Amino acid sequence: IPPRAARRSTTSGIADTVLKYGRQRLVLDNHRFIGNVGWRQNEQTYDAFTVVNRSLAQTTVTAGYIYNVNRVFSDESPVGNFRMNSPIFNVKYDGWRAGTLVGYGYLLDFDDLPANSTRTFGLRFAGGMPFGDDLKALYTLEYASQSDYRSNPADFNLNYYLAEGGINTGRFTAKLGYELLSGNGSKAFQTPLATLHAMNGWADGEPAWWLNLQA
């Protein structure tokens, strides 16, 4: 089936479980690893089989198998699709007052871009605690490990770190964060399915001509 001809079906006959097959939107956590690039007119969608189960208290288990990614480009573009064979899982527990704990694994096996094939496992904790009148402390900690997967010709093991702190006043939010995607001189930590513009910071916020003038 051509990627854009995929159909979608949804089943919810199993208690606390939703099954989906075909074209669908996938957004996990803060879009850092799996996102939909939703600000685009043509957002990123996934041809996949997914299972979302909430039978355990305060726990959401998402598991799936992605066989194609419909990127923000047209099907006429040579980079319009990522064909792949990629199992994913994401387990979220939000039963603690202090925050939400997430464990995840994304095993991305690209058919036509083997150098992008990676295996990523990580943990994320994010939350907030009220203090004073209408004030809330915000915090996030995340770590992930990424290595080569399947037909990737490289051999590497890289790390991802995120630490954020902030405050919310009810009307305003201010945050300060540090994010590191490590590299070894030839390979770098990759997140090809992310909502990338949301993560690129100053590198994505300046027009190229201005950067050239500063060089």
Question: In which residue ranges do the predicted regions lie?
Answer:
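Transmembrane beta-strands of outer-membrane beta-barrel pores
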Residues: R23-L28, Y65-V69, G105-D111, Y143-Y149, ...
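Transmembrane beta-strands of outer-membrane beta-barrel proteins
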Residues: L19, Q58-A63, F89, G99-G103, ...
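Short loop/turn motifs that connect adjacent beta-strands in outer-membrane beta-barrel proteins
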Residues: S9-D16, V51, A57-Q58, W96-T100, ...
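Outer-membrane beta-barrel channel domains
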Residues: I1-R71
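Residues on the lipid-exposed face of transmembrane beta-strands in outer-membrane beta-barrel proteins
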Residues: A5-I14, F49-N53, F89-Y93, L123-G127, ...
